Design a protein with these regions (language model features):
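The conserved acidic donor/metal-binding loop of glycosyltransferases
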Residues: 141-145, 225, 239
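N-terminal membrane-anchoring/stem segments of glycan-assembly enzymes
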Residues: 1-47
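Cell-envelope/extracellular polymer assembly enzymes that use nucleotide-activated donors
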Residues: 49-52, 82, 234
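Acidic helix N-cap motif at the loop->helix transition within catalytic regions
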Residues: 65, 92-99, 149
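Long helical/loop segments within the catalytic core of UDP-sugar-dependent glycosyltransferases
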Residues: 107-130, 148-228, 266, 270-280
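Short beta-strand-to-loop acidic/aromatic patch adjacent to the donor-nucleotide binding site
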Residues: 131-145
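Short, acidic, metal-binding catalytic loop of nucleotide-sugar glycosyltransferases
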Residues: 69-80
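A conserved acidic beta->alpha catalytic loop
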Residues: 87-95, 110-112, 145
Length: 280
């Protein structure tokens, strides 16, 4: 009996090792394609598209102004994009700061529905009368700073026929502490060896919470009907299941602020893990 148990455990261990090895072999093969420079997709049109930019914000009075200023400095025709701040359950001066920076503000108060997914769905419902006014939606987190060429790059992606595209999430504070430095290494690795690699292979990367574009007609009729707390991943998977191929824009750069202390990082990672588990 004991020999049978030992043999069973040994077999289980070997199977587990093979599964892990196959997983890492799969990751290695995909990551190799990140080193290959592929020919760009052909331009299907040379249109200058019109963008609606949504900035969901909950008590972000200290950072929202910097984001708006970076968007207003875009090297893109200013008449072709509108900036909306969704002040979501704010108890500070986020809405006032946004208005002072000259953008349109929508204030939302619903203590039972607090996530970004609910805020985006609520906002899109308000925008249904603007169905024909825009070509694509861009979404950013309130603590971001956006590279001046972001809209030009996303416009090019639309001209190439892309409909759902993730931008390059870089780090605003990589040298502040060892924690933020660790985040920087993580995102740099993911950007190169996951997002770019999968895109080069014709596979879909995932939406990463901020700095992404969705073609307007893909979104405006159905809204942002996600049910979980990881609304970005859920939205990506819903569209992948419908046959939508997600795109990757390595030159559409946004700078994102990361935690400085281990305690802040632990809380964030714990929150992300719980939210990801809720999708299972």
């Amino acid at each position: 009996m004991t020999d049978a148990i030992v043999k069973g455990l040994s077999t289980f261990q070997q199977v587990l090792v093979w599964i892990i090895n196959l997983f890492w072999l799969y990751q290695f093969i995909i990551s190799i394609t990140s080193l290959i420079k592929f020919k760009e997709k052909p331009m299907l049109t040379d249109k200058k598209h019109r963008f609606i930019i949504a900035l969901p914000a909950n008590n972000e009075e200290n950072v929202i102004g910097n984001l708006i200023k970076s968007l207003k400095m875009q090297d893109y025709d200013k008449s072709l994009f509108d900036i909306y701040v969704i002040a979501d359950n704010c108890t500070d001066n986020t809405a006032e700061v946004a208005r002072e920076n000259g953008v349109i503000v929508y204030e939302r108060f619903d203590e039972t529905k607090k996530t970004k997914g609910y805020a985006l769905n609520w906002f899109l419902d308000k925008m249904k009368d603007k169905k024909d006014d825009y070509d694509a939606l861009l979404v950013f987190d309130a603590d971001n700073v956006v590279d001046k060429n972001f809209l030009n790059v996303m416009n090019k992606k639309l001209c190439q026929g892309e409909v759902l595209v993730q931008g390059y999430r870089d780090i605003k504070n990589p040298t502040d502490t060892w924690v933020s430095g660790g985040y920087a290494i993580f995102y740099w690795t993911m950007n190169r060896l996951y997002h770019l690699a999968r895109y080069n292979m014709g596979l879909s990367p995932l939406i990463n919470g901020t700095a992404f574009m969705v073609k307007w007609d893909l979104l405006i009729d159905e809204g942002w009907n996600t049910k979980t707390l990881t609304e970005d991943i859920e939205f990506a998977l819903i569209n992948i299941s419908k046959g939508v191929k997600l795109g990757w824009a390595k030159d559409a750069i946004v700078y994102d602020e990361q935690p400085l202390t281990f305690k802040e990082s632990w809380k964030q990672r714990e929150r992300w893990s719980v939210r990801t588990y809720s999708m299972c």
